[in-house]
Amino acid sequence: MTYLTGIASAIGISHFSLCQSSDASTRSPRVVFSGIQPTGIPHLGNYLGALSNWVKLQKSSAPEDELLFSIVGWHALTLPQDPAALLAARRDMLAVILAIGIDPNRSIVFHQDHNPNHTELCWILNCITPMGKLRRMTTWKSRLAASRNAGSESEVDESLLNAGLFTYPVLQAADVLAYRATHVPVGEDQQQHLELTRDLADIFNRTFKAPSPMFPLPLYVSTKCAQAPSKRILSLKDPTSKMSKSSPDIQSRILLTDTAAHIKAKIRAAVTDSIQGITYDPVSRPGTSNLLTILAACSDSDVTEVARLYENKGHGHLKSDVADAVEELLKGPRAEFERIRHETQYLADVAARGAERARLRSEETLGEVRKRIGLA
């Protein structure tokens, strides 16, 4: 979970940019929540699309705004996990968050699974969530499609899929509503889940009215500032698909831990085309356009302006510059990550402090929820 303006509008989610200037004296403090799964070292797409935006939010937020960034271990369990690998991945993801610049003194940084209030609220929300809404969730439908493609039967066998995957969006809603978050940065694939979160907040508010609405309807966050907004980074080997940690081809993605030599080799082998000159055309030239997108994102530049600089150059020149730009972007966070990941006591202390702050914050919400539903 990494919690496009056009898409948000199309499905009815209000959006807001925390980078917009505003008079803090004329508005209420904002509560921003976002989470990321601890499944492997983040790749360039994660960094440019979600993690770097967390840093922008931290820098641009007002002093009275609350920021919560969570490693959502319970969500990872919807798919089979090796326990030892998951334990290491949780610790590494915390190190990554700190390495990129999230300050645990300014923001609440914590492991979701260290705060049982999430699962308690998830159960309560499950009891007011219509089955029909969950069946329309794209996560569930995509797993059904995968099941159908894997087997020879024409009918999908839902018994092969776990209930956690089916109710995953409700846990995501609980993650957000436990802190009465007002703003949620989400990725393109999670926008439908944010709409469900707003629906469940509204259902609870209407069902348990007194004395006033319990939950705000969280807004989709756009981090578009004066700089160019982050673009979706695609696979280096299949530029029709997004860069993904789950791809079996390690050459398809650039990891935060990749050395300069690894980065150069992966960019050099990236799929492009045989057309002379460089132009930005995502439909006809997805590979070339993906490299231009990466280069523009690394420098917070407009991709069409970047493309004009290369219109009379070749792919070799472009790939060399992209590799240099990516290395320049990642070398600082990479070095900091390698330093922090071995400081196990420091990481444990940060996690413990973050969990305590998160529990105190969410207990206020759960206490009121229990009272309203009759369980106080």
Residue positions per predicted region:
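Conserved nucleotide- and phosphate/pyrophosphate-binding catalytic cores
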Residues: 44, 198-376
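Short helix-capping/linker segments at secondary-structure and domain boundaries
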Residues: 129-136, 178-185, 296-306, 334
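N-terminal Rossmann-like or analogous alpha/beta NTP/dinucleotide-binding catalytic cores
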Residues: 18-33, 38-174, 328, 338
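Short capping/connector residues at structural and topological boundaries
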Residues: 41, 49-52, 114, 130, ...
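N-terminal mitochondrial targeting presequence
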Residues: 1-29
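Structured ligand/cofactor/substrate-binding pocket environments in proteins
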Residues: 42-51, 68, 72-73, 83-89, ...
